[in-house]
UniProtKB/Swiss-Prot annotation:
Matches recorded under SUPFAM superfamilies: PRTase-like
Tissue expression remark: Testis.
Assembly: Homodimer. The active form is probably a hexamer composed of 3 homodimers.
Keyword Oxidoreductase tagged: no
Species: Homo sapiens (Human)
This enzyme's EC code(s): 2.7.6.1
Pfam families: Pribosyl_synth, Pribosyltran_N
Known cofactor(s): Mg(2+)
MF annotations from Gene Ontology: ATP binding; kinase activity; magnesium ion binding; protein homodimerization activity; ribose phosphate diphosphokinase activity
Protein name (Swiss-Prot/TrEMBL): Ribose-phosphate pyrophosphokinase 3
Residues that, per the record, bind Mg(2+): 128, 130, 139, 143
Family the UniProt entry places it in: Belongs to the ribose-phosphate pyrophosphokinase family.
Length: 318
């Protein structure tokens, strides 16, 4: 494809390489380093004048460093006369801080949106935003892609009894997501209501729905410390589920998450590769990874060629 350049930040170079390979492109040359005072320095090592530039950087690892690196890369390309700069952010940072949940609390997701725009981003491509209204924080186009088509494909190919499964949301906020998946599989859905007094701490959970003698599939957009999904798995087994799977778009797995998964009753915990999982898989045999590079690559191709990306909301590209 002419007049297109793809650059990778340092947060997820493996995913960036897969995207570039699917597009038949080489990753652009970029040098990232830290000064002795820990300031980030980025040098774009090739011309981007008049080019359609895509910068792949996921909000993971050292998130603040990754975000700052992305902002500097966007700005470097913009002031080097790139015709358009698109930030490809598979896992959007600060997405959970999307509203004021108490007095004097910040709306950090809006701040990140402002920073990306001011840095010079013309377009954002992301996946399964924690809150879809974050798209409205931007004054530039935002394509929020969905992992759902790849999730449906994985379920059909890897769970033999999927026709006798039940899709479960671990909280009320995910009801729309699970009903969509359940409708397409033509199966039932259930809901777990949780009462949370403090962040990352769940006080009690109530199951709404019948999971007896069924394979239960927990579906959520992300898992961080995994307290919620592990408690939910125990609740589902005690309610009569034969097996329990968890399918998550963003596997953050911070703190004691991996040890919790290892001791929990999951058949498998399935995540996409919006966040690197290689190190975590070494310590947890239950983790399975769905590759979503083909969705991001096709979104880039369609954006570059001026085509609609809505096809990707319901189909897995070849």
């Amino acid at each position: 494809m002419p007049n297109i350049k793809i650059f990778s930040g340092s947060s997820h170079q493996d995913l960036s390489q897969k995207i570039a390979d699917r597009l038949g492109l080489e990753l652009g040359k970029v040098v990232t380093k830290k000064f002795s005072n820990q300031e980030t320095c980025v040098e774009i090592d090739e011309s981007v004048r008049g080019e359609d530039v895509y910068i792949v950087q996921s909000g993971c690892g050292e998130i603040n460093d990754s975000l700052m690196e992305l902002l500097i890369m966007i700005n470097a390309c913009k002031i080097a006369s790139a015709s358009r700069v698109t930030a490809v952010i598979p896992c959007f940072p600060y997405a959970r801080q999307d509203k004021k949940d108490k007095s004097r609390s910040p709306i950090s997701a809006k701040l990140v949106a402002n920073m990306l725009s001011i840095a010079g981003a013309d377009h954002i491509i992301t996946m399964d935003l924690h809150a879809s209204q974050i798209q409205g924080f931007f004054d530039i186009p935002v394509d929020n892609l969905y992992a759902e088509p790849t999730v449906l494909k994985w379920i059909r190919e890897n769970i033999p009894e999927w026709k006798n499964c039940i899709i479960v949301s671990p909280d009320a906020g995910g009801a729309k997501r699970v009903t969509s998946i359940a409708d397409q599989l033509n199966v039932d859905f259930a809901l777990i209501h949780k009462e949370r007094k403090k962040a990352n701490e769940v006080d009690c959970i109530v199951l709404v729905g019948d999971v007896n003698d069924r394979v239960a599939i927990l579906v959520d957009d992300m898992a961080d410390t995994c307290v919620t999904i592990c408690l939910a798995a125990d609740k589902l087994l005690s309610a009569g589920a034969t097996r329990v799977y968890a399918i998550l778009t963003h596997g953050i797995f911070s703190g004691p998450a991996i040890s919790r998964i290892n001791t929990a009753c999951f058949e498998a915990v399935v995540v996409t590769n919006t966040i690197p999982q290689d190190e975590k898989m070494k310590h947890c045999s239950k983790i399975r990874v769905i590759d979503i590079s083909m969705i991001l690559a096709e979104a880039i191709r369609r954006t570059h060629n001026g085509e609609s990306v809505s096809y990707l909301f319901s189909h897995v590209p070849l």
